[in-house]
């Protein structure tokens, strides 16, 4: 538990740092949920602010309407009978009384009399009449003529839509105020008053109608409409989106950590899955908690959710948030690439929430619904529905069946179950699905004993071979299955512990060609305190073996014990002691170096933060990053990143097993030297497994060397054993002076003295000859002859060494690999000489289109997501558009309805009151109303309170009072009506009038509503055949589908840019517009699948789109052509496919949706309000939206074609011309404009460097800085030649060129390349050497056009790279350091593509491709995707891409970085063969490579050229005779240097690593030293103390070290570290040593040597004297020297205590 807590805290700190470093992203994660909730709240708020009118409105007022505005139609069956005529006349009297100025003739015109209902309705339905009609009065019976019947029946007719549905009595929130608004009650009260007059009952009344006092006076009640229409249905989706949107980045980052191996690297170094997931969950809460709080505050604080308690809602949302986090973990496990992970997971979760909406409405038991709740988004939708229904039930809006509704408590139970289930699934899936990396357990792992009963590591678990010779795990000859067991050094007893024991380890991979064995039954032991080096060709199985040992890869068969624990069963325990450096950097770009080291220090065991910081700083200094501790890792160079990874591996108190996989790959000599020193200094107490391609590094560091090929162990032993076994003597290395060098002449002289001599290799400018050991006595004569004939034989220099590991490797490699390309093959010769026939646009376009076809075909998942998923979304939209039920927005029910209070039941009581101010009237009213059994008299001042409290079940009430109008006192009669009762208002008017007239006049009144047929309004006519919802959903889903597909296309562009594929294509001669044209064409083709599908289906299913097909297809095509280039532009904002796709989709869809919904709302308002001003404003808004979004342009066209309400102009009933200026033409024109603008913009953006270069030429150019005063004479001479135009015909010319990077903010400017003038003639290979940051890559970038120079001129092939970039790069090849290969193409497809890019004739492409495949020995893998190639094979493909087409200039950036010596020599031969007719510029960190292939070179430092010339010239100028490299025997580690300098007094120590040392032996002209004499001294006097040595002219390595200031201070530091780390070991060795004779003979001499005295001009640190000094005082003086000198060494404790005791 303690370890869990500690790892958790450490991870949380790291996560917090990462979030803190990405403030903008973090703010976006916080704002995104707020925006989602803001949209929900906005919709709800709009519904809440539209509240009904609770003020009284006149129900009478007939006389104010009729005549002045409207006519009243009157009809009966036949002519009006007298009594009916009396009623009509009384209506006329009412008008006359109200308007005395009206003439009788005018009043007569206010009425139209008909003799049947049909005639009256026909008049009303006439479009010319209906606007002037108030309504109709129909007398049902005409069998009475003079006397009134007992019940006078009449019907009122108005437009059916001006009444409520006569078939329904009660409907929540429907309201009967409609009868007030459309003159029904005005007619009713006037006719009733006319009947009163006919019966001589004179009671003038003013009737008003008023809704019941608002019972929903509380905040929670004001949301009722929004709750019912929005929250109840879609609330679950909004809540899910708001919370899960914060997990989008979490999922993407998790998958990216898995994809980049960071996660597995952390696990390898001891991280457990549980704290990792818990830390991610807690870190997710940084965004989830605010999101959840916002949701709770909005829902509960605003009282959207009322009935449900705070704590219930909080529990539900907390559980739901936890479940979403766990669900995100589950979903992320199914993605190995971050490409679409975040977006797909987001869509999946939203779909789950959408399923919840459907589950709410299906009529099944709660048990079934609870099963659906196993998906937590479904559960939140059900919970939201239940909570909303409870609130709606309180206001009687719904009457739910609770037996089929899941309750909140049930949801809480299911969410708890979900959390537990999801947590178990995370645990289970994490174990059985490892993804691309890591070990997968069997599906039944939890049933195995080994999983639950872990074995603990202890001392007894370690196999001590000194006591267990017969152990089954002990490696003996009988354990070896190899044919040549003599190639294996078997140590029967070893003093160290066997910490790693590998037995029969095997790994098989499934490939398209069947199974491929990567590691073939490997068995080997590795020991503590030793460095075990894995060597082998690329793809030999080294990294796979390390992967299996660290748990990164699952074993197919076999096993290994690490510290006594089985890797197949106890990998988690093993990892507690492991440190690892993978080939891929396991760092976060936004964390600093110090933050990385602190994090890993704490992760690996330093619980105290202060202690972790101290160790982190110490480690940062030890790996050479003391000046970069506070720099972000993303700003470090490649070498510095490797150093950081090295520090990460070694930091921690328990990192005792170290796996270093090509740790020094790509490092410059300085960095590599520092790394080697560091590894040596840390060896004690550790087992280090190192894989490398540097043989000198393996020789220097390795205690044991294992060489693997094709997964098999070829040999194993100490470096000395392997050299003796495979070297068989000495290696003579001759450097050729020119191409005329004749190796046969050299061999003739050699064989004259040494018969058994033979050529080992002939690569580039180096010839290696094997000299047998027994020929040693002939060396003096042989070298004397060789020296005499040196110039004649065209020998530049030569050196001799005892067999090297490189030789061993080459010898073994020759058995398994091809190391020399067959240049004599006619096909190869033809391929190498095949030149471009001229760049052809059509050919380039063809090549790029084939590339896109191949990558699309091979990346099926991406195709599914980018095309198939959008097609599904599109199909869903079409299905909804076709099948969604049309909802009528008007009432067309004409069924008559007779109003009666009895419709509300026999037990209904009508509350009423009377003011009591006129006793006579009050009495008459009481007598009339009191007769009813339904009435209930209340005090006037209590009525409204009563209605408020008794809202439910009361259809209506009324109150009598008085009012004064124009000094006339009149009876006031107010009807209160309940909103939920559709016809309450006319019913209660009829109820009162009927009772009063029955009591006072003896006649009853029966009023009936007999609606006219509905006359559709403009809006209704516009929507008559339109399905609102269908159109809206169709358009939204269409926008989503196209947004998704173009976002995916943009992701591909972002990926190619980030991988530098686009740059390589441009440098190779691709015309930029062809690149964009090819992408546009292919993306158009893919997108037009959707276009065709949409066009065909929509035309088939919908006549409107069929009729306007030209407009629709034109808009659709232009829409696609506009959004793709716009998406390309957006892609520049992101460097990963996944983030580009997700964010671009969000931008497109979000903006398009927002603008489209705004359009819907505005257009509906325009037509409903019939508002010309609003229409003009909306037109302007349209134009603004057209300008900003092509998505809105297309949605507008769809809106127009679908005849969405408001698309027609006011006053028009249809669209006469869909292409009109107010309709389809503007959006189509804007779409065309978008297409043009965005396409041109991406071109301009890409052509900007050329345009800028042409503009800057001669304008505002910065003057080059003056040449340095101490400039080398050769560099100065070259400058003079270039400036005097003596080299104007050379292919490469740099004239006063420099590059200045401007510092941002307070950062200083960085002059990356100083004033440089250089020319390179044809046929020359030019080497650029220098430390990281010296300016090599910047120089190469400027030469290739990637980087714009700050000043000066650069000419390539005679063209200015700034102003004539395309011409300059027409015949240029580039091999980038980062390969820049297309992973989904095979080697053949890759080379074929660049053949077309470079303009090779189509008829020659196939043979050229096959020739390159043959030359590069790629035949067996030529059809496999490059992504699966080893590093060496990738470099072969990259080199092929660079040289295909026989370019005149080749830039090779670290061409052999990370490849084994066999492949490296292979490449050197290729380069040597190619350079005959071209310029090759090579950057490299390999001095051996430079010596082998370069004709001329420069060493750069701080942007300046420190030297210039051929290798021999630089050796002659900066070298000083001979260089001697030696490797001492272990017992002479400290004394060897002094002993060596004793025999060769003039030898200067140049470099020192552990047992190895490099000396420089000056060779003055006065007394030159012969090579034969040097050999004689070494063989005679120094041989007993040496394991190995080599002698030669001063190497370029030594000169490099000298010119880059790798000087004496470094030597002192190296010696200091050697003393600290080896003094104990050597003392132990010395105690066990019998003092060999050589040491005895020299002891007196060495003891008299002062530690401060040296024959060399440099103060030498006499570490060797520690063993030879005879007195303790001398030893302590040495300690004092160490302490007082400028080394500032922190002495080991035992030394300090010893010193104090004296």
From Swiss-Prot:
BP terms from Gene Ontology: lipid transport; sorocarp morphogenesis
Gene3D superfamilies found in the cross-reference section: P-loop containing nucleotide triphosphate hydrolases (3.40.50.300)
Domain ABC transporter stretches: 500-735, 1292-1527
Chain residue ranges for the region called Disordered: 1257-1276
GO molecular function, one term: lipid transporter activity
Keyword set includes Nucleotide-binding: yes
Residues annotated to bind ATP 2: 1330-1337
Annotated TM spans: 30-50, 236-256, 278-298, 311-331, 340-360, 362-382, 412-432, 860-880, 985-1005, 1026-1046, 1081-1101, 1109-1129, 1142-1162, 1180-1200, 1225-1245
Coiled coil: none
Stored CDD domains: ABC_subfamily_A (cd03263)
Its membrane topology: Multi-pass membrane protein
UniProt-annotated location(s): Membrane
Any single Gene Ontology cellular-component annotation: membrane
Keywords noted in UniProt: ATP-binding, Membrane, Nucleotide-binding, Repeat, Transmembrane, Transmembrane helix, Transport
Annotated ATP 1 binding sites: 536-543
Major location category of this protein: membrane
Pfam families: ABC2_membrane_3 (PF12698), ABC_tran (PF00005)
Entry-linked InterPro entries: AAA+_ATPase, ABC2_TM, ABC_transporter-like_ATP-bd, ABC_transporter-like_CS, ABCA, P-loop_NTPase
Entry keyword annotation includes ATP-binding: yes
The family this protein is said to belong to: Belongs to the ABC transporter superfamily. ABCA family.
Protein name: ABC transporter A family member 3
Origin species: Dictyostelium discoideum
Taxonomy of the source species: Eukaryota, Amoebozoa, Evosea, Eumycetozoa, Dictyostelia
């Amino acid at each position: 538990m303690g370890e869990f807590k500690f790892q958790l805290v450490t991870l949380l700190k790291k996560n917090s740092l990462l979030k803190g470093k990405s403030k903008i992203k973090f703010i976006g994660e916080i704002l995104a949920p707020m925006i989602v909730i803001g949209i929900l709240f906005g919709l709800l708020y709009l519904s809440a602010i539209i509240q009904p009118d609770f003020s009284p409105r006149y129900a009478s007022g007939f006389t104010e309407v009729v005549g002045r505005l409207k006519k009243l139609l009157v009809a009966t069956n036949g002519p009006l009978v007298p009594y009916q005529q009396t009623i009509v006349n009384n209506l006329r009297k009412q008008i006359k009384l109200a308007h005395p100025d009206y003439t009788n003739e005018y009043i007569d015109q206010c009425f139209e009399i008909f003799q049947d209902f049909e005639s009256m309705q026909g008049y009303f339905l006439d479009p010319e009449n209906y606007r002037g009609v108030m309504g109709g009065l129909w007398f049902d019976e005409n069998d009475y003529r003079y006397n009134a019947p007992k019940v006078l029946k009449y019907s009122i007719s108005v437009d059916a839509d001006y009444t409520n549905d006569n078939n329904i009595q009660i409907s929540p929130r429907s309201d009967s105020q409609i009868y007030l608004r459309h003159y029904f009650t005005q007619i009713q009260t006037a006719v009733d008053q006319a009947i009163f007059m006919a019966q001589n009952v004179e009671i003038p009344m003013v009737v008003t109608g008023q809704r019941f006092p608002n019972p929903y006076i509380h905040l929670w009640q004001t949301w009722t409409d929004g709750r019912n229409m929005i929250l109840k249905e879609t609330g679950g989706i909004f809540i899910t989106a708001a919370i899960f949107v914060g997990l989008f980045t979490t999922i993407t980052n998790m998958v990216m950590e898995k994809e980049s191996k960071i996660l597995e690297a952390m696990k390898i170094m001891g991280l457990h899955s549980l704290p990792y997931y818990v830390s991610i969950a807690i870190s997710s809460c940084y965004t989830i908690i605010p999101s959840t709080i916002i949701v709770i505050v909005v829902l509960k604080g605003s009282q959207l959710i009322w009935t449900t308690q705070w704590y219930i809602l909080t529990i539900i949302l907390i559980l739901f948030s936890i479940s979403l986090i766990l669900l995100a973990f589950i979903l992320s496990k199914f993605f190995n690439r971050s490409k679409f992970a975040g977006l797909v997971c987001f869509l999946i979760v939203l779909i789950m929430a959408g399923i919840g909406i459907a589950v709410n409405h299906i009529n099944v038991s709660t048990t079934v619904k609870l099963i659906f709740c196993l998906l937590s988004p479904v559960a939140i939708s059900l919970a939201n529905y239940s909570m909303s229904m409870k609130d709606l039930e309180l206001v009687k809006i719904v009457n739910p069946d609770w037996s089929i509704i899941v309750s909140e408590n049930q949801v809480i139970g299911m969410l708890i179950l979900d959390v537990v289930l999801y947590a178990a699934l995370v645990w289970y899936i994490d174990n059985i699905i490892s993804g691309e990396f890591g070990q997968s357990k069997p599906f039944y792992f939890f049933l195995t004993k080994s999983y639950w009963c872990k074995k603990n590591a202890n001392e007894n678990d370690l196999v001590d071979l000194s006591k267990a010779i017969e152990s089954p795990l002990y490696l003996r000859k009988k354990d070896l299955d190899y044919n040549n067991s003599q190639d294996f050094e078997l140590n029967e007893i070893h003093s160290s512990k066997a910490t790693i024991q590998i037995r029969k380890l095997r790994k098989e991979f499934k490939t398209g060609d069947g199974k491929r064995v990567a590691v073939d039954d490997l068995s080997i032991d590795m020991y503590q305190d030793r460095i075990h080096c894995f060597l082998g060709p690329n793809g030999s199985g080294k990294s796979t073996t390390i992967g299996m040992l660290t748990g990164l890869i699952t074993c197919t068969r076999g096993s290994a014990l690490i510290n006594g624990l089985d890797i197949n069963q106890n990998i988690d325990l093993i990892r507690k002691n492991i440190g690892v450096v993978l080939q891929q950097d396991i760092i976060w770009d936004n964390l600093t170096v110090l933050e990385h080291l602190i994090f890993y220090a704490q992760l690996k065991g330093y619980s105290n933060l202060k202690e972790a910081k101290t160790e982190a700083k110490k480690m940062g200094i030890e790996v050479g990053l003391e000046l970069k501790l506070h720099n972000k890792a993303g700003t470090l160079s490649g070498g510095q990143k490797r150093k950081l990874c090295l520090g990460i591996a070694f930091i921690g108190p328990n990192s005792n097993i170290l796996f270093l996989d090509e740790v020094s790959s790509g490092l410059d000599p300085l960095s590599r030297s520092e790394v080697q020193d560091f590894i040596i200094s840390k060896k004690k107490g550790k087992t280090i497994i190192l894989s490398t391609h540097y043989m000198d590094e393996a020789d220097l560091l390795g205690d044991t060397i294992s060489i693997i090929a094709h997964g098999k162990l070829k040999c194993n032993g100490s470096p000395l054993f392997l050299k003796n076994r495979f070297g068989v003597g000495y290696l003579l290395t001759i450097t050729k002076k020119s191409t005329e060098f004749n190796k046969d002449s050299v061999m003739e002289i050699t064989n004259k003295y040494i018969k058994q001599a033979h050529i080992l290799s002939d690569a580039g400018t180096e010839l290696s000859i094997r000299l047998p050991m027994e020929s040693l006595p002939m060396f003096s004569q042989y070298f004397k002859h060789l020296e005499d004939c040196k110039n004649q034989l065209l020998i530049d220099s030569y050196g001799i060494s005892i067999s090297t590991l490189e030789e061993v490797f080459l010898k073994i490699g020759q058995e398994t690999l091809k190391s020399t390309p067959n240049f004599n093959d006619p096909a190869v010769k033809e391929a190498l000489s095949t030149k471009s026939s001229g760049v052809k646009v059509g050919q380039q376009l063809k090549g790029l289109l084939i590339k896109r076809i191949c990558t699309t075909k091979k990346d099926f998942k991406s195709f599914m997501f980018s095309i198939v998923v959008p097609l599904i979304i599109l199909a869903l939209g079409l299905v909804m558009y076709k099948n969604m039920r049309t909802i009528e927005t008007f009432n067309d029910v004409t069924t008559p309805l007779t109003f009666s209070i009895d419709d509300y039941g026999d037990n209904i009581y009508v509350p009423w009151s009377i003011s009591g101010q006129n006793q006579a009237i009050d009495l008459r009213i009481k007598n009339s109303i009191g007769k009813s059994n339904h009435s209930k008299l209340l005090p006037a001042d209590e009525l409204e309170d009563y209605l408020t409290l008794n809202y439910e079940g009361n259809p209506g009430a009324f109150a009598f009072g008085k009012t004064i109008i124009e000094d006339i006192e009149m009876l006031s009669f107010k009807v209160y009506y309940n909103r939920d009762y559709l016809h309450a208002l006319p019913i209660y008017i009829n109820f009162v009038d009927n009772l009063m007239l029955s009591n006072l006049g003896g006649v009853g009144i029966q009023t009936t509503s007999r609606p006219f047929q509905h006359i559709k309004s403009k809006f209704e006519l516009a929507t008559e055949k339109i399905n609102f919802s269908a159109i809206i959903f169709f358009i939204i889903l269409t926008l989503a589908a196209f947004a998704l597909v173009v976002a995916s296309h943009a992701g591909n562009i972002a990926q190619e840019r980030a991988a530098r594929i686009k740059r390589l294509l441009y440098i190779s001669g691709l015309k930029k517009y062809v690149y964009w044209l090819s992408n546009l064409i292919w993306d158009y083709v893919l997108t037009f699948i959707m276009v065709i599908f949409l066009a065909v289906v929509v035309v088939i299913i919908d006549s409107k789109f069929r009729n306007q097909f030209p407009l629709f297809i034109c808009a659709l095509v232009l829409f696609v052509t506009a959004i793709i280039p716009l998406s390309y532009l957006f892609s520049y904002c992101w460097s990963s496919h996944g983030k580009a796709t997700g964010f671009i989709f969000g931008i497109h869809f979000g903006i398009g949706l927002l603008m489209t919904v705004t359009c819907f709302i505005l257009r509906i308002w325009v037509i409903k309000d019939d508002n010309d001003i609003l229409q003009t404003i909306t037109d302007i808004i349209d134009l603004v939206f057209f300008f900003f979004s092509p998505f809105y342009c297309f949605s507008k066209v769809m809106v127009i074609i679908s005849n969405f309400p408001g698309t027609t102009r006011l006053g028009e009933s249809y669209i006469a011309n869909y292409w009109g200026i107010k309709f389809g033409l503007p959006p189509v024109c804007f779409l065309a404009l978008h297409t043009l603008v965005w396409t041109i913009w991406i071109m301009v953006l890409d052509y900007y460097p050329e345009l800028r270069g042409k503009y800057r030429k001669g304008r505002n150019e910065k003057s080059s800085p003056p040449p340095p005063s101490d400039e080398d004479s050769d560099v100065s001479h070259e400058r003079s030649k270039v400036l005097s135009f003596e080299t104007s015909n050379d292919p490469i010319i740099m004239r006063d060129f420099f590059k200045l990077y401007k510092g941002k903010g307070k950062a200083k400017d960085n002059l990356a390349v100083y004033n440089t003038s250089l020319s390179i003639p044809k046929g020359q290979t030019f080497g650029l050497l220098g430390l990281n940051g010296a300016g090599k890559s910047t120089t190469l970038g400027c030469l290739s056009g990637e980087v714009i120079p700050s000043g000066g001129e650069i000419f390539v092939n005679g063209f200015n790279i700034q102003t004539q970039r395309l011409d300059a790069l027409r015949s240029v090849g580039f091999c980038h350091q980062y390969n820049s290969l297309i992973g989904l193409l095979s080697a053949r497809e890759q080379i074929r593509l660049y053949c077309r890019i470079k303009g090779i004739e189509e008829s020659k492409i196939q043979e050229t491709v096959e020739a390159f495949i043959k030359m590069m020995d790629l035949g067996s893998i030529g059809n496999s995707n490059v992504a699966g190639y080893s590093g060496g094979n990738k470099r072969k493909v990259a080199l092929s891409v660079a040289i295909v087409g026989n370019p005149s200039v080749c830039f090779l950036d670290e061409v052999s970085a990370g490849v084994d010596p066999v492949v490296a020599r292979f490449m050197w031969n290729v380069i040597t063969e190619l350079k005959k007719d071209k310029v090759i510029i090579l950057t490299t960190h390999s001095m051996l490579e430079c010596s082998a292939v370069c004709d001329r070179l420069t060493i750069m430092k701080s942007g300046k050229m420190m030297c210039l010339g051929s290798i021999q010239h630089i050796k002659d100028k900066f070298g000083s005779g001979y260089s001697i490299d030696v490797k001492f025997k272990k017992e002479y580690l400290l004394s060897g240097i002094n002993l060596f300098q004793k025999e060769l007094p003039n030898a200067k120590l140049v470099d020192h690593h552990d047992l190895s040392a490099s000396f420089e032996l000056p060779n003055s002209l006065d007394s030159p030293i012969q090579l034969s004499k040097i050999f004689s001294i070494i063989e005679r006097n120094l041989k007993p103390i040496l394991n190995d040595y080599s002698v030669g002219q001063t190497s370029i390595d030594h000169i490099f070290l000298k010119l880059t200031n790798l000087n004496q201070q470094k030597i002192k530091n190296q010696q200091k570290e050697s003393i600290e780390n080896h003094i104990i070991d050597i003392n132990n060795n010395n105690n066990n040593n019998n003092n060999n004779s050589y040491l005895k003979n020299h002891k007196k001499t060495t003891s008299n040597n002062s530690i401060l005295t040296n024959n060399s001009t440099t103060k030498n640190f006499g570490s060797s004297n520690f063993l030879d000094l005879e007195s303790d005082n001398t030893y302590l003086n040495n300690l004092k020297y160490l302490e007082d000198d400028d080394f500032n060494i922190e002495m080991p404790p035992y030394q300090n205590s010893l010193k104090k005791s004296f």
